């Protein structure tokens, strides 16, 4: 079972505190696996591998966080998800990231956007021959006591100019895009949210030893 908490625009520090609360409850088995879905006011956050040259050059504040990955931006028009999920042993961090990617690739497909994984790069991408790869969703996670924190940010209709002040995710040869840019119309967070709920419910939770083994028909996704 995957539960959801739906919020509007929440300051980053407030959402981070809520993540920690839910994480402690999930570790103690007091709640089911739970995903926060929300937006943030404009903010830069830097993962543990962020280099100085990747930070904004104009002195814009950056919040250091305990997730993997590098620097990114969050803000209105971007649907942010924080899945708090207890993983089975042995812990498969890469598998967790891949399941998030698969869910978001499916969301993009639901809207008519062909998105893919790019080898060696986390997140969800749009690729075109002869053009730079364009990131449409960023992913950065942390696992503590077998339970995940942080998650993903899917660009619906944000102001992409914020990304020009940084080296997003430490990738100077890549660009950032959104569902609205790719489709040529305004794609809102409200439109995308139910699709994300459906696809996370379908893909996110890992198989556990007690789960029913699916038939070949139900496993063909």
Curated annotation (Swiss-Prot):
Family note: Belongs to the LipB family.
GO molecular function annotations of the record: lipoyl(octanoyl) transferase activity
Localization terms from the record: Cytoplasm
Pathway as given in its UniProt record: Protein modification; protein lipoylation via endogenous pathway; protein N(6)-(lipoyl)lysine from octanoyl-[acyl-carrier-protein]: step 1/2
GO BP annotation list: protein modification process
Domain of life: Bacteria
GO cellular component terms listed in the entry, alphabetical order: cytoplasm
This protein's name: Octanoyltransferase
Annotated Gene3D superfamilies: Bira Bifunctional Protein, Domain 2
Catalytic activity: octanoyl-[ACP] + L-lysyl-[protein] = N(6)-octanoyl-L-lysyl-[protein] + holo-[ACP] + H(+)
Enzyme class: transferase
Note: In the reaction, the free carboxyl group of octanoic acid is attached via an amide linkage to the epsilon-amino group of a specific lysine residue of lipoyl domains of lipoate-dependent enzymes.
Enzyme Commission numbers on file: 2.3.1.181
Keywords, in A-Z order: Acyltransferase, Cytoplasm, Transferase
Cited SUPFAM superfamilies: Class II aaRS and biotin synthetases
Source organism: Acidothermus cellulolyticus (strain ATCC 43068 / DSM 8971 / 11B)
